[in-house]
């Protein structure tokens, strides 16, 4: 603690001092509200709504509203908010992050700001990490909200559009970050406004905010359709990768990448029968080889992914859960499928995408809760404008956190851990053991079996039994091995007689690269003032120590002449570990910041497209816009074709008319001879007059009302098609940006500049295609209004955790020979699919 903090207190304590008078005000209503009947208490909700309608603010009514929610909670749930929970609730209402330790009742805390903000009628979203927790919290807390006259909904994976709309229209809606994000994307792909499900994004409370806004920040949400690329080349590239020897490639563990050596490049040129592997023409080969190398030499089975039912499934590195339905992007998933010799799925095409960073920044007010946020305080402030307030615990923490024990080898470390578990088991003290991978869990499990220690294993392979196992983990004599405990969401309550033997003992088998994940594991013990104990066991062979800890530490151990059996506990070692973790956290922050800088370019473009889509959906007449598009397309065509040279005048006019005949102009309506005596401006006028006259005739033929609907459907269809292609193009542009840094060019600035040019090209393409389709479309008078309820496949789990790979949902693909959904009556391939 610095001198400033010693004198003035920490930032959190200074901020909490400002909140205490509001807490005292809330307390002052207690006796009065206890005397109210249930009906009188319930009527307070309507009174508050009236006060807001008459100009009062949420802050004006906060003390009284919190007091009402507190009294209602005591009556309905049998739980009365402590003063610390009131502080947490105020911090959330202020749009900040409440850091509250495990077992301090975060779910109950959220009811206070949720109730207050729901009174405005604009909706409150409570985000949890999985469907199970969303349903559990909604079921429990809807009793309280219902008592106070508010409605509660929950968004889970298998709801249809009608059920989703109903849930979003409730006063308070629970759900996962994935579901909310996907619904936002789908709402911006609909053709009719009635198909949208979300309201405007108002106030959001994110539970486990560090997991969602930090761990998953590198994870774009992607809605995808099937691409056209063949999968055969993945098998060829995999075969090549498997023929390589160790000196044909180098593995960079820090960046998790593999590159061919000179010798490897020679082998590639020979294998693929090419002269120069680095040639731009061979980018396709390079891409497949890079992914095959990564799949074979950095991606580990049962650590990064599992093969289950002949399918490759990603394992979440933060929670150890299986992430069914998610796929690695950029062909890596297909490369792993080739490596494991399972069916290779086709690459997909991105239809819509957004990062969590940009989704959550759209809320008018954002807040969050977690047990561990302080280590990432700078990132919360810089990226989201959120500050972290540490809320004091209701009872003092009685857990003992022992210093780390360091062994020379991993083998010696695990032997010591097993001995420690066996000793603890003898006195019937429950033990929770945290591991970093499924592989390590199973190794430890085998060692404990040989030692005769009964235990439970909790990891991705068995997560169906998860809640059941966790509910018993605090009972006498229980030994539970768990892959990373982040986001488990279930408290471990101590069984009878456990306090007497020292509470829950937590053993970490390795330091995670994030201090926060270590703190989460520690925090499982010692909840609500319970006794407890935690300790981490580390070896110099652990990934974190091997890759990031300094060589100096290795030197110290050598000098001490430690044998495999010896262990050291020292401040220097603990500092070295913490510095290694800070180094990794810094690297990860830089990566997330870089992702955001690139995504901000896409985000500005996305906002323009989605805003215009929204205006079209809201039924604003497009007639003037379409006429402006017609004028713009014709003017630009004339400017592009007319060189101003007399000797090429006739040729210029012939090319101009041929070009416009493709778009709208019937043959022989106007001739080169008629136009060659006119100025460019007069030519524009003649051609625009013809177009406007033709358009008026088409409108009369189908009725103005029907024409407005056709304009809307066609414009949306073309915008969507062009936007999807633009997303792909921007993705390719971004992949090429790494080379710009070598040319002394700022890659982000280059991406911004070129991306802006590509966006302008896309807008011009939208105008031209819209005009072209509107002139060419043949409309059947009685054609039924198009319904485009886009269905996504349901192969995605509730999406916990934070893989750094895109989360994808799949869209149904329109067949080339199906009728075009735009209502033209033509086959898709001859209409919008051209």
UniProtKB/Swiss-Prot annotation:
Residues 790-809 are annotated as: Disordered. May bind 1 zinc ion per subunit. Pfam families: P-loop_SecA, SEC-C, SecA_DEAD, SecA_PP_bind, SecA_SW. Zn(2+) binds at residues 820, 822, 831-832. It is found in: Cell membrane; Cytoplasm. Gene3D superfamilies: Helical scaffold and wing domains of SecA, P-loop containing nucleotide triphosphate hydrolases, SecA, preprotein cross-linking domain. This is Protein translocase subunit SecA. One of its GO terms (molecular function) is protein-exporting ATPase activity. Its main location: membrane. ATP binds at residues 85, 103-107, 491. Its EC number is 7.4.2.8. Keywords: ATP-binding, Cell membrane, Cytoplasm, Membrane, Metal-binding, Nucleotide-binding, Protein transport, Translocase, Translocation, Transport, Zinc. Part of the Sec protein translocase complex. Interacts with the SecYEG preprotein conducting channel. Has a central role in coupling the hydrolysis of ATP to the transfer of proteins into and across the cell membrane, serving as an ATP-driven molecular motor driving the stepwise translocation of polypeptide chains across the membrane. It comes from Clostridium novyi (strain NT). Monomer and homodimer. Part of the essential Sec protein translocation apparatus which comprises SecA, SecYEG and auxiliary proteins SecDF. Other proteins may also be involved. It comes from the Bacteria. It is a peripheral membrane protein. Disulfide bonds: none annotated. Its cofactor is Zn(2+). NCBIfam families: PRK09200.1, PRK12904.1, secA. It catalyses: ATP + H2O + cellular proteinSide 1 = ADP + phosphate + cellular proteinSide 2. One of its GO terms (biological process) is protein transport by the Sec complex. The lineage of its organism: Bacteria, Bacillati, Bacillota, Clostridia, Eubacteriales. One of its GO terms (cellular component) is cytosol. Belongs to the SecA family.
